Amino acid sequence: MLSPKRVKFRKMQRGRMRGVATRGNTIAFGEFALQAQECGWITSRQIEASRRAMTRYVKRGGKIWIRIFPDKSITMRAAETRMGSGKGNPEFWVAVIKPGRILFEMGGAEITPEIAKEAMRLAQYKLPVKTKFIALDEQQKQSAAEAPAAAEAVNVES
């Protein structure tokens, strides 16, 4: 399972998940991807379960990229422990996910859209956040449609 080799501080604050993902929200390596639709924490166990589900379905067909890494420690106190006496010990690691973040990518010569969609569907069941399947050509069409609109907005202002 994934976890950092070493960290500067073992115990972290929980934090808040606001806004959308500004980084890691485009397909970078493969042709198909699984994109988060809501915010949440994904544990290293859930990432591993999703990875196994996808690799078992595609067998040796293509390549899978994991685009998230669990770098936040979650601490827990022992059961039936009184309040006080400090923060609990780190129990597991999570990746903080915001809407729009690409979680997994898939590509390769043998990977068809149908195979990729089914493999990603199996991975979706293992995750605690809503996700959607996207393809590289869909993303390029969407960004091409947004580019002229942004250019018109600049022309109107000047």
UniProtKB/Swiss-Prot annotation:
PROSITE patterns (UniProt xref): RIBOSOMAL_L16_1, RIBOSOMAL_L16_2
Gene3D superfamilies (alphabetical): Ribosomal protein L10e/L16 (3.90.1170.10)
UniProt GO BP: translation
Gene Ontology terms, MF aspect: rRNA binding; structural constituent of ribosome; tRNA binding
Gene Ontology cellular component terms for the protein in this record: ribonucleoprotein complex; ribosome
One Pfam family linked to the record: Ribosomal_L16
Keywords: Ribonucleoprotein, Ribosomal protein, RNA-binding, rRNA-binding, tRNA-binding
Subunit-structure text: Part of the 50S ribosomal subunit.
Role: Binds 23S rRNA and is also seen to make contacts with the A and possibly P site tRNAs.
Family named by the database record: Belongs to the universal ribosomal protein uL16 family.
Name recorded for this polypeptide: Large ribosomal subunit protein uL16
Species whose genome carries this gene: Parasynechococcus marenigrum (strain WH8102)
